[in-house]
Amino acid sequence: MNDTVMPHGDFRSDTVTRPSAGMRKAMADAEVGDAVYDEDPTTNRLESMAAERLGMEAALFFPSATQANLAGLMAHCGRGDEYIVGQTAHAYRDEGGGAAVLGSVQPQPLPNEPDGIIDLDAITSAIKPDDFHNPITRLLTLENTFNGLPLPADYIEGATELARSHGLATHLDGARVMNAAVATGADPSAIADRFDSVSLCLSKGLGAPVGALLVGSKELVGRAKRIRKTLGGGMRQTGVLAAAGIFALERNVDRMREDHDRAKRLAEIFADFPELGAGEARTNMVFLSPDGVDMDAFSTFFADRDIITGSAHGKLRWVTHLDIDDEAIERVRRACKEFFGR
């Protein structure tokens, strides 16, 4: 539980978390230098820590995971090249079309299954033949977790092997990869090992106020550093931000189990009201697909009781995080009973 704020019921996203007192102190005490010149010791330490944690050679600090993903895509693909991506993946649907707008990289979206996978035969069929009429397919990008669901390890292995057999690089949008690791019991490096690059967001479940990392080989990170400068992401005394990331990686990964447990309790509460159409909680998210329930009225009823939820792709999304405590979960239980008159 965040020790600087009162318990509240903001379930919109794990991005709403606020730094704890310990994290704020680490930020205030951070040793800083000019990160563009690689002279910020705290940022350098964070990058080394992230690379080691994910089993990669190098890492680069970014203002956001959106920019980290974009730099990763552009580091793998040149102008006019193509990357394969899920049709409902964040990197394609929710990041402003950056690869196309800023990188002149063409997306080839393919349908995601409900669990986030992309059919392997569809991937094979989407890879363009070596013909000058076609863009060159350079990259396969996957997302883990996907709507709160960890990708199956055997699928990751099969998809990345398929990509390599066709000469494609692989990138993982791992904004919540630590949630996937905690939920499956896998070491984060075992998940990252299948990919050429991985992005990691610090400002979601990890609880930092800002920041993300791109990890990969030294060569790829070197290209991404040049791209980061072009995108305006080269910042100076970033140690005050990196210190929050270090604090998060050291203290907030294992505690994600608490978020996952609370999400499971939410799912159990919602399951008592079948008309809410609650999905299962595999990590820190629960999705509702109400049947015969006015979603706006439902959300307004809860908001009037200081319980805020979000929506995503036609569903209500509930996300647990370090600012959600047991009392917040019980408030949801009481509000559900009141709403349905039970």
List where the protein language model places each region:
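Conserved PLP-enzyme active-site core in the AAT-like
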Residues: 2-324, 332-342
